[in-house]
Amino acid sequence: CSSDLIGRLPRYFRYLGELKDDGIERISSQELSAIMKVTASQIRQDFNNFGGFGQQGYGYKVEYLYEEIGKILGLHKTHNLIIIGAGNLGQALANYMNFERRGFLFRGIFDNNPALFGKRIRDLEVQPMEELETFVKENEIDIAVLTIPKDSALEVAERLARQDIKGIWNFAHIDLNLSKEIQVENVHLSDSLMKLTYNINRYENGLSKSSAIRYRLCI
């Protein structure tokens, strides 16, 4: 699947979940298009990549589609996670309740700062990095979340790779490239913010150009 399609799947899942909670039982691609601001043809094309899910002229069963996309996203089972880095971002992620509702269960949080050892963040106690490997093995950790400086991210990722971890959600300011067996999602929060400022700048430039055109037409 293309990266664009993979990026749309969580949006489909989120919107369908809201429709299900609102008691909507069936929806057409046109109706979903109006809600999500994605063309109806794109929606049908996306769903056809996974078998279609609906019938022409009949639409989609919301609950069924929600469950099937959840399976594609791997949300039909729970995932055990750890956070490495107990700073502001790590603590914010640990405190975010919605992860648990999606089946993402935080089992531990680690840091190399002795001042944080033993600190409780929700029901997690900050542990030293020396205990990382043992904890990962004993608790069958699937995913590690890195909220640490980029200087130490690669070393920590390689330590995790040796423990047969399945995936890394990386917030460190470095793109990690590990073996094919380990899935890595590199997240740069500033990238999203820069996309926003690009769109603001493009909109403002468009207004400036249209104002200049109107001015020239008036003189």
Segment roles from a protein language model:
Residues 26, 30, 35-78:
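HTH-adjacent hinge/linker in prokaryotic transcriptional regulators
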Residues 89:
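Hydrophobic/small residue at the entry helix of a nucleotide-binding pocket
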Residues 86:
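Glycine-rich Rossmann-fold phosphate-binding loop(s) that bind the pyrophosphate
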